[in-house]
Amino acid sequence: MSLLKMRRHAIHSSDSTSSSSSEDDCFERRTKRNRNRAINRCLPLNFRKDEIRGIYKDRMKIGASLADVDPMQLDTSVRFDSVGGLSSHIAALKEMVVFPLLYPEVFEKFKIQPPRGCLFYGPPGTGKTLVARALANECSRGDKRVAFFMRKGADCLSKWVGESERQLRLLFDQAYQMRPAIIFFDEIDGLAPVRSSRQDQIHSSIVSTLLALMDGLDSRGEIVVIGATNRLDSIDPALRRPGRFDREFLFSLPDKNARKEILKIHTRDWNPKPVDMFLEELAEHCVGYCGADIKSICAEAALCALRRRYPQIYTTSEKLQLDLSSITISAKDFEAALQKIRPASQRAVTSPGQALSAIVKPLLQNTVHRILDALQKVFPHVEVGTNKSLNSDVSCPFLESDLAYSDDDTPSVYENGLSQKENLNFLHLNRNACYQPMSFRPRLLIVGEPGFGQSSHLAPAVIHALEKFTVYTLDIPVLFGISTTSPEEACSQMIREAKRTAPSIVYVPHIHLWWEIVGPTLKATFTTLLQTIPSFAPVLLLATSEKPYSALPEEVQELFTHDYGEIFNVQLPDKEERTKFFEDLILKQASKPPVSQKKAVLQALEVLPVAPPPEPRPLTAEEVKRLEEQEEDTFRELRIFLRNVTHRLAIDKRFRVFTKPVDPDEVPDYVTVIKQPMDLSSVISKIDLHKYLTVKDYLKDIDLICSNALEYNPDRDPGDRLIRHRACALRDTAYAIIKEELDEDFEQLCEEIQESRKKRGCSSSKYAPSYYHVMPKQNSPPVGDKKPDQEQNEKLKVPCTPVACSTPAQLKRKFHKKSKWHVGTKIKRRKISQAKDNSLNAMNSSSRSDTEDSQHTHAEHTEPGNTDESSVEESDKQNRLESNIDLKNNSSSSNIENELEEPKETTEGTELRKDRIVCRGDASASQVTDIPEDSESKEMDFLRMTLARGSQVEQQELISMEQALAILSQPTPSLVLDHKQLTNILKTVVKKSQKYNIFQLENLYAVISQCIYEHRRDYDKTALVQKMEQAVENFNCSRS
């Protein structure tokens, strides 16, 4: 930060006799300098400044990255153990990056090169960037560091022609120089979109440059390129081949085991930790939630717990003291979080998979299990998709494949181990029955009557159980809702993607309506594409129908046959399932007493004390030393600036009369009028003694010079008027110079340093020159009789010595607290001492005093305040001190009182008023004031109580006192309920709903629930039981 606003002029010189060779050299140096400046911006994110040696230290001076650091800043706390449910992806990344560094001998033995490129694709929030950050941190440990470069797709784009390609070349060049290195392109679809004739030529050139850099004639060496996108179809196909992006990793939505691992990661630092059973149940309800959604659920649950325990913090802006141990996260906090957080997968397109709700789970859970058993016979891959296999464990992902990691011995493929047998088969590609499940065109049709829930409950529950598989929905809204593509094109694209991502599921809900609505072209396209799927490809066709199998069209019947168990008929719930369905509602929820709010009200009324401001972290000795050095550098600039201003004022002939202090021998009455003498030489001395920490302190002394001159020199003769004009000019000149040349930020910095030193208790004169403190001891004898005044910090009144020039800074720091009565006290003592010593000099030098006193600058910046506006206590203290002195020096004090008539009258008037008040309080008036004292004391106590309760009233705005008292005063009556009547109602409901379908049962459940809700606050449940009986009796299933 520069102190003065000075202009810097650059001098350019050129030699006209320079040869062409020198010009070429200058051009080459300029070109090299520009290239280095551009390379300086391409530096890895995971290297700190102190870790880069040599030339890289200079490169860090410009910037660490071209990318925006805010959204892409590297979080060093993210490791591979912070990523859950992606063990296979992490293992593949270790093979690409970590293992070639740790085990180079393996790759050297077989002369192989590990994969140098991979592509992450999948929905948003599934952990693509998180895995990249974890990889960067894992590569930043150990001796062999890996430089990690992170770029977003649009970072390399520029409006200048050829600049984007140049930035890419510089990026790869920098990564090659710092190899091994990783380049991560986030949202690469914005950098390398599909090239076409309709596209802009600039994008095509960028894509061509990126293709050549990744796998061109020049080998890129130990540079791993990782791309991430959620739009795989938007990337140029040339990037998706071996040599560029060798591997493609699908980041799908996490399954149940992966969600549980993610929950464990986000709750592992909680105290106490959630139990494993709760996390498993929570993971089961988080269907369709990505990793970012699960993290948001944990954060929202913590906020719900805080909101429930301390609602007071939402009604005040001050920080309150909280008991963190009383904030506990319960299951209902997670329930509230699940209701608030909507999964990312359901914001754009609703996922077809959905678990059975807690209400219908007792009714349909057995049916779902029977469907899964029937599906396992048709589609054996169900076992892989539903079992809790070991591949979810990060420590053993190799157990996933039985074929690759079996203990079976195979024939040797080397020349030294080959036997002499002929016609030996090495590869057994057709022997897969022992290692993986196999099925022939797996298909399943769930049929039933309308209202059996096959499309609304059963099929989504089955898809939810098979959540490891990718699901492609071919319903009517999907086919006809996309305006840019035809239904035939959308159908063919989905089935092709299903074949590519096998094992997968093609889901066709309401196939009876689907087949009636679509045209013959779409029917032919659908059947043809199904036939093109390989016979043993694990692509399941799942469909639902609300018509019997015999009522379906012949083409649909040909797709599903009875002989292979591809038809599942949904049956009505039996008696046991209906009993479980209504049992919890009728027997438990109906008998639940009203919710008590007394605990919540007490928590809302709890008064929380205001938390003290957080104390700053204590600095170490080294940090304190470094901080003091920086502060002293700033104050050194301040002193240089103030000396410059003072010097400019002193050399001005107009202000020569203010450069030296007044001689007391020539002007004896000066110290009796002016309480704080000040001049420019004293200002210089204070600068040398480090008394000025801000420019405001300096300007106070300039104002002091001006006010002293105006006070001592009355506006009577021309000489005094000239001095008064010059004093005002001195003040205006000083202010103008500082206003013009001082930086406002620098003044603010000085004030912050001054405040920081006060808090730390650091002395402002610690670095002051030591010889200044020796001089006053040699000049102290002339003022030896004023030693008591020095004990009271009144060293100010010796104007001819350096002490008088340096001590005002000590007085200025205490000016607002003590200077008033100290100066008032010293007026009398000064008058006494100087009356004895200078009585004759005052008469002899009266003619010279009018001219010589004008050379002084007379202080007391707030002089009238010390006499007219002093407080009662200050005047009383001053009166006592003056009365003691007057007893000893009656004659001399009377002479001095005549010199200061007006200030004395004012002071005495204040003292007399004080004396009158004190006397009346000590006399008979005390009886008159006794009665009001009691009432006033009560009012004061009430006022204190009101002020103390101010924060409480503000906190209690959350709930009114009347409402709180009404809730707390309510008695808790006993619950009146006949359980036998509830049991009879349950039997009646189960018997009456014998032939009800799923929708009718849900309707009856809603009717009973409404009755319970209406009487939820009643302790007498007799009316509830009667209303439930009436509702069950009057229920008509025809409207369902």
UniProtKB/Swiss-Prot annotation:
One of its GO terms (cellular component) is nucleoplasm. Residues 784-797, 849-863, 874-885, 901-919 have a biased composition (Basic and acidic residues). This is ATPase family AAA domain-containing protein 2. The gene is Atad2. It catalyses: ATP + H2O = ADP + phosphate + H(+). May be a transcriptional coactivator of the nuclear receptor ESR1 required to induce the expression of a subset of estradiol target genes, such as CCND1, MYC and E2F1. May play a role in the recruitment or occupancy of CREBBP at some ESR1 target gene promoters. May be required for histone hyperacetylation. Its EC number is 3.6.1.-. The modification Phosphothreonine is found at T801, T825, T972. Residues 1-11, 811-833 have a biased composition (Basic residues).
